From Swiss-Prot:
InterPro entries, alphabetized: Bombinin
Taxonomy of the source species: Eukaryota, Metazoa, Chordata, Craniata, Vertebrata
UniProt note on tissues of expression: Expressed by the skin glands.
Protein name: Maximins 3/H16
Keyword Secreted: yes
Residues making up the propeptide: 19-43, 73-122
Annotated localization: Secreted
Gene Ontology, cellular component aspect: extracellular region
Amino acid sequence: MNFKYIVAVSFLIASAYARSVQNDEQSLSQRDVLEEESLREIRGIGGKILSGLKTALKGAAKELASTYLHRKRTAEEHEVMKRLEAVMRDLDSLDYPEEASERETRGFNQDEIANLFTKKEKRILGPVLSLVGNALGGLIKKIG
């Protein structure tokens, strides 16, 4: 009798443990899915913000280029224009990321590709903002 009781209790404990492990796995997988969805949403929002920022910077650079286009430029202004043109090419290259697609086909994971884009955007946006700030500062000084 005691042996049957011990076996029955052991079976109940084992089945309860198996159910709890299964429930834990399900809740973890549900959390993983929710985390992945929220990360996708955050990346989507970040992408939209960066896209808007790129568009604004392109517009500002084009406006600066058009103001410098129809008058004589100093050597410094000519250098600024060359830098703006280079920045515009770099911003356009963000829209067509050939490097990333090549890396993806070679087996890089998505995190490495996202880090590559983040580094590239930081490398481009820093000089763009300083160039636009310097050009606008120069225009304000000339106007004022």
